[in-house]
């Protein structure tokens, strides 16, 4: 999976579609990949990441919650730490799934 990711990024596409990119990676490699995504996003590359992981989503600038094929809610990181943003994402995920 790491090789496939590297091959997709080498051409510096305008947009990267990452569907559950950390699903088959261990924690260290997941964090390395997510940090890489943050870095290349700061360089102007757009990344559209599909994930069910609050931790993975916490590396994004903006998170969209999709329900029944429509945008249900969105959050902006706006200077929050990854840890604080992950907590906010988790709370919103719980609400979306009918929790609290």
Segment roles from a protein language model:
Residues 11, 43:
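Conserved signature/switch motifs of ABC ATPase nucleotide-binding domains
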Residues 16-19:
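Catalytic Walker B motif of ABC-type/P-loop ATPase nucleotide-binding domains
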Residues 27-29:
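Helix N-cap at the start of a conserved alpha-helix in ABC-type nucleotide-binding domains
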Residues 33-34:
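Conserved hydrophobic alpha-helix in the ABC-type ATPase nucleotide-binding domain
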Residues 45-50:
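Conserved H-loop
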Residues 59-65:
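Conserved catalytic segment of ABC-fold P-loop ATPases
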Residues 70-94:
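Conserved beta-strand-loop-alpha-helix hinge in the C-terminal portion
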């Amino acid at each position: 999976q790491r090789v496939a990711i590297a091959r997709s990024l080498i051409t510096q596409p305008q947009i990267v579609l990452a569907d559950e990119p950390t699903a088959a990676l261990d924690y260290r490699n997941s964090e390395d990949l997510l940090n890489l995504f943050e870095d290349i996003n700061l360089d102007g590359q757009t990344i559209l990441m599909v994930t069910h992981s609050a931790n993975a989503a916490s590396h994004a600038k903006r998170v969209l919650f999709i329900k029944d094929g429509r945008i249900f809610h969105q959050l902006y990181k706006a200077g929050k730490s990854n840890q604080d943003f992950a907590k906010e994402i988790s709370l919103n995920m719980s609400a979306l799934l009918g929790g609290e």
